[in-house]
């Protein structure tokens, strides 16, 4: 089986940075324990990234995943997830007697602060994203009153837009660039003027999606590897499938639909921004063995 593997597949800068910060806390805790000091408890606030294998590995190291601020105990070292958290939660975390390490992706943090600045200037946010995604919940916390979220142009068309309101447009950092531009054009037509835009979709997302599209146009089938909870991975699968090629999204090689793939001559392989290289490698080896 011939496999074309995306060069952009695997960890992005934000994920790598978040995991390095968490690893550093784990290493420091182990060093202190080796010196005879009590081992401090390490936790993340929410899953550090959206990948089940990575989360399982950290759980095996004793890293806890907290969901509520009141779960934080004195002396805990708490690492904020790569997706960021609502600013009210971050403030509450920092009020606890704990060490708080912010592992929010720099691109997400920039989006948070940009949204806050626009809202302070009197504009109202229109956010293209998944309403229940943790990054989106965090972004909205910087937006104040009146912010509106939409996950598609169809949803945008159904929003109660007010002609007298000064809007600005932003997106979840891992959103589909093409769909974002369609939304931007629709707003221009609907409101009769260009809406100010925050360019919050990160370059890594844009490059990954474009490479997935390019590969999908050359192959008989497309395999996208990454957590089912990962929004950026789901969108890679979406943009690949939109090219008319059979596309499958799996978390590891054991989930591959072997019989459907066996007759393919060329298979494309890409992966989400939170997928470890080891899983991508294992998937590639399995595909090449078919």
Swiss-Prot record:
Binding-site residues, [4Fe-4S] cluster: 12, 105, 202
Alphabetical keyword list: 4Fe-4S, Iron, Iron-sulfur, Isoprene biosynthesis, Metal-binding, Oxidoreductase
Pathway where it operates: Isoprenoid biosynthesis; dimethylallyl diphosphate biosynthesis; dimethylallyl diphosphate from (2E)-4-hydroxy-3-methylbutenyl diphosphate: step 1/1; Isoprenoid biosynthesis; isopentenyl diphosphate biosynthesis via DXP pathway; isopentenyl diphosphate from 1-deoxy-D-xylulose 5-phosphate: step 6/6
GO function terms (MF aspect): 4 iron, 4 sulfur cluster binding; 4-hydroxy-3-methylbut-2-enyl diphosphate reductase activity; metal ion binding
Record's keyword annotation contains Nucleotide-binding: no
Superkingdom of this protein's organism: Bacteria
Cofactor(s) the protein needs: [4Fe-4S] cluster
Active site: 135 (proton donor)
GO terms classed as biological process: dimethylallyl diphosphate biosynthetic process; isopentenyl diphosphate biosynthetic process, methylerythritol 4-phosphate pathway; terpenoid biosynthetic process
InterPro entries listed in its UniProt record: LytB/IspH
A Pfam family: LYTB
Free-text function comment from the UniProt entry: Catalyzes the conversion of 1-hydroxy-2-methyl-2-(E)-butenyl 4-diphosphate (HMBPP) into a mixture of isopentenyl diphosphate (IPP) and dimethylallyl diphosphate (DMAPP). Acts in the terminal step of the DOXP/MEP pathway for isoprenoid precursor biosynthesis.
Name listed for the protein in its UniProt record: 4-hydroxy-3-methylbut-2-enyl diphosphate reductase
């Amino acid at each position: 089986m011939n496999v074309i593997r995306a060069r952009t597949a695997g960890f992005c800068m934000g994920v790598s940075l978040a995991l390095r910060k968490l690893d550093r806390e784990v290493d420091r805790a182990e060093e202190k324990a080796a010196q005879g000091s009590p081992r401090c408890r390490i936790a993340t606030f929410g899953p550090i990234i959206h990948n089940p294998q990575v989360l399982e590995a950290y759980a095996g190291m004793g890293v806890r995943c907290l969901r509520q601020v009141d779960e934080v105990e004195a002396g805990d070292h708490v690492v904020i997830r790569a997706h960021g958290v609502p600013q009210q939660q971050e403030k509450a975390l920092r009020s606890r007697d704990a060490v708080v390490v912010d592992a929010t992706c720099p691109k997400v943090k920039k989006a948070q602060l940009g949204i806050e600045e626009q809202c302070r200037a009197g504009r109202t946010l229109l956010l293209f994203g998944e309403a229940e995604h943790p990054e989106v919940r965090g972004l909205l916390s910087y937006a104040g009153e009146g912010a509106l979220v939409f996950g598609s142009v169809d949803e945008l068309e159904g929003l109660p837009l007010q002609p007298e309101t000064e809007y600005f447009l932003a997106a979840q950092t891992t959103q589909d660039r093409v769909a974002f531009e369609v939304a931007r054009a629709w707003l221009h037509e609907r409101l009769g003027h260009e809406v100010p835009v925050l360019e919050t979709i990160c370059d890594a997302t844009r490059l990954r999606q474009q490479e997935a599209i390019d590969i999908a146009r050359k192959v008989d089938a497309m395999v996208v590897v990454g957590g089912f909870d990962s929004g950026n991975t789901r969108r890679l699968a979406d943009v690949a499938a939109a090219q008319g090629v059979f596309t499958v999204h799996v978390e590891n090689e054991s989930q591959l639909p072997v019989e459907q793939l066996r007759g393919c001559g060329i298979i494309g392989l890409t992966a989400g921004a939170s997928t470890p290289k080891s899983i991508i490698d294992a998937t590639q080896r399995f595909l090449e063995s078919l």
